[in-house]
Amino acid sequence: MTEIKLSGINEKGEEKEFSVSDFKGKKIILYFYPKDNTSGCTKEANDFKDNMNELTKHALVIGVSPDSIKSHKSFREKYGLNFVLLSDPDHKLAEKYEVWKEKSMYGRKYMGIERSTFVLDENGKTLKEWRKVKVNGHIEEIISFLEK
C-alpha cells in the first residue's frame, strides 16, 4: 500500500503531517465530509465531539475533507472539536476510499466528497463502511457497531 501523507491538526489543534502508518495498531473511525463550517458537516463534527468519551473506548476519530489547514483550525476552534482533522486538497485519501465522486446540485455537476465513514481495524483493514451518510442518527449507528 502506498503511503499517503497529509497535513492536518491533531486533537490538541497542533499542525502536523500525518501518514497512514502513524495510526497502525489503533482502531480508527475515518470519516470523510464535504466542507468545514457547513450545516451538515458541522452537525456531524459536533456529534463526534459530543460522543468522544464513548467513541474513544473503541477507536480514534479522524475527519477528512479537502479544506485547508487554516479552515480546519478555524472549524476546530469555533466548535471545540477534539479529534484529528486531515486536509486532503488533492483528494488522494478520498480517491483511495472511493469517496471522491461526481455530484450534482441545481443541475450543475462537480466533483466532491461523498459523506462516508469507515471503521478500520488495527492493521487498516475496513471492518465497516457507511456511504452516502445521512447525518441524523449516524453517530448512533457507529456506536452500535463498535459495541458489538
Can you annotate each of these PLM segments?
Residues 1-148:
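Chalcogenol-based redox active-site neighborhoods
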